[in-house]
A protein has these predicted regions:
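Glycine-enriched alpha-helix->loop->beta-strand junction motifs that scaffold or abut catalytic
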Residues: 24-28, 84-86, 126
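Non-cysteine beta-strand/loop elements that form the S-adenosyl-L-methionine
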Residues: 32, 85-95
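Glycine-rich, proline-tolerant flexible connector loops at the mouths of alpha/beta enzymes
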Residues: 36-41, 92-112
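Glycine-rich, positively charged N-terminal anion/phosphate-binding segment
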Residues: 8-79
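Short, charged beta->alpha transition segments
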Residues: 74-78, 83, 87-88, 115-122
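Alpha-helix-loop-beta-strand connector modules within alpha/beta enzyme cores
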Residues: 51-62, 106-130
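Structural preference for beta-strand elements that scaffold enzyme active sites
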Residues: 2-4, 29, 60-64, 87-89, ...
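General structural feature for long, well-ordered alpha-helical segments within catalytic domains
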Residues: 4, 16, 72, 76, ...
Length: 130
């Protein structure tokens, strides 16, 4: 059996993950709180702190992206690959009302044609494991 550590908003940042890993370990993958790319390139300070390799040494980290924009997703994947990440998680499960209202997370699932186009584009333009 594999054990995956899912993020809880505002709680399971890199400090918590490191403390948990040092005390308990036995987690196969730690998923980061989501990165939510916008038209502004780069990461917020919080996002950067959560994904910096120096803040996650020895942890099997999977960065998570929350977007419905293929261009932003691909740009963010490339930035994450520059940090050494080769596996990325696309968040299609967040049920938060503010996220769903923007047709992101689980809200993107109801937009089948848009989701199909999005997936076609990201899989054709990215070689990361998604």
């Amino acid at each position: 059996m594999k054990y995956y550590f899912a993020p809880l908003e505002g709680i399971t940042g890199y400090i918590y993950r490191n403390a948990y890993h040092n005390l308990f370990g036995q987690i196969d993958k730690y998923f980061t709180p989501f990165v939510s790319p916008t038209s502004n390139e780069g990461f917020t300070t919080r996002e950067l702190n959560d994904i910096l390799p120096a803040h996650n040494e020895g942890l099997p980290i999977i960065p998570q992206i929350l977007t419905n924009n293929a261009e932003y997703f691909i740009r963010t994947v490339n930035a994450l690959k520059d940090f050494g990440y080769d596996e990325i998680n696309l968040n299609l499960g967040c049920p938060s009302g503010t996220v769903v209202a923007k047709h992101k997370g689980s809200g993107f699932l109801s937009e089948r044609e848009d989701l199909d186009r999005f997936l076609d584009e990201i899989f054709s333009k990215s070689n990361a494991k998604i």
